[in-house]
Amino acid sequence: MQINKYIDHTILKADAPKSKVQQIIDEAKKYDFMSVCINPTWVNYASQELKDSDVKVCTVIGFPLGANTSELKAFEAKNAIENGADEIDMVINIGAAKSKDWDLVESDIADVNAVKGDKLLKVIIETSLLTDEEKIKACQIAKAVGADFVKTSTGFSTGGAAVHDVKLMRQTVGPDMGVKASGGVHNLEEAKAMIDAGATRLGVSAGVAIMEGLTSNDSY
């Protein structure tokens, strides 16, 4: 198992300085992680820094609340791609999901999916705020719209990835769609548990600790 290729090496804290973003980029190069996941303001910089590597640039859209309008999310995604993003992690309209307004949840994802081109779209459903029934429905919609991944969490809500949720998401979307476990993975043991549950990508700030067999208490 090349666990490094499961890892989106992540820094999304509002107060992360350029030096911390550079550290994440340098570590991603060293360990050949799948991507760096950074806020949109850093996308162009990271794209330039990583242009001679295999590391992808991932960013977040409608983050972390998912409460922007669909039009704004689509603009954010288009702008990020123009700046060099390879992968887009968008937050669903969580309030719409809790209201059972599934048409809005669907159109919201579809509007972003329509501008992704050949880039990857991951759909964050924020599992800690949804019932199992709502998680299943959100995953079904993301798959039907044409997203590439479903993702558990932003890392900024009431909880992160749980094995139960990853299993449920994998069962819902089947074997061919990506599932990203994000938030709360601190070491190799926890990373392996998520992969065993069906995760094909891990959103972590503990990428180095996972590679070194250590435990990290870092958050996003």
Curated annotation (Swiss-Prot):
The record places the active site at 89, 151, 180
List the Gene Ontology MF annotations in alphabetical order: deoxyribose-phosphate aldolase activity
Main EC class of this protein?
Answer: lyase
Has keyword Magnesium?
A: no
Show the catalytic activity. Answer: 2-deoxy-D-ribose 5-phosphate = D-glyceraldehyde 3-phosphate + acetaldehyde
Q: Which UniProt keywords apply?
A: Cytoplasm, Lyase, Schiff base
Q: Name one GO biological process term.
A: 2-deoxyribose 1-phosphate catabolic process
Task: Provide the E.C. number(s) assigned to this enzyme.
Answer: 4.1.2.4
User: Which InterPro entries does the UniProt entry name for this protein?
Assistant: Aldolase_TIM (IPR013785), DeoC (IPR011343), DeoC/FbaB/LacD_aldolase (IPR002915), DeoC_typeI (IPR028581)
- Xref: SUPFAM superfamilies: Aldolase
Cellular location(s):
Cytoplasm
Involved pathway(s): Carbohydrate degradation; 2-deoxy-D-ribose 1-phosphate degradation; D-glyceraldehyde 3-phosphate and acetaldehyde from 2-deoxy-alpha-D-ribose 1-phosphate: step 2/2
Leader peptide range in chain numbering: none
Lineage: superkingdom: Bacteria
Q: Which residues cross the membrane?
A: none
Read off the SMART domains from this record.
Answer: DeoC (SM01133)
Tagged with keyword Lipid metabolism: no
Which cellular components does GO assign to this protein? cytoplasm
Family annotation (PANTHER family): DEOXYRIBOSE-PHOSPHATE ALDOLASE
Summarize the protein's role.
Catalyzes a reversible aldol reaction between acetaldehyde and D-glyceraldehyde 3-phosphate to generate 2-deoxy-D-ribose 5-phosphate.
* HAMAP family attached to this UniProt entry: DeoC_type1
NCBIfam families (UniProt xref): deoC
The family annotation for this protein states:
Belongs to the DeoC/FbaB aldolase family. DeoC type 1 subfamily.
Stated name of the protein: Deoxyribose-phosphate aldolase
- Species per Swiss-Prot/TrEMBL record: Lactococcus lactis subsp. cremoris (strain MG1363)
The gene from which this protein is expressed is deoC
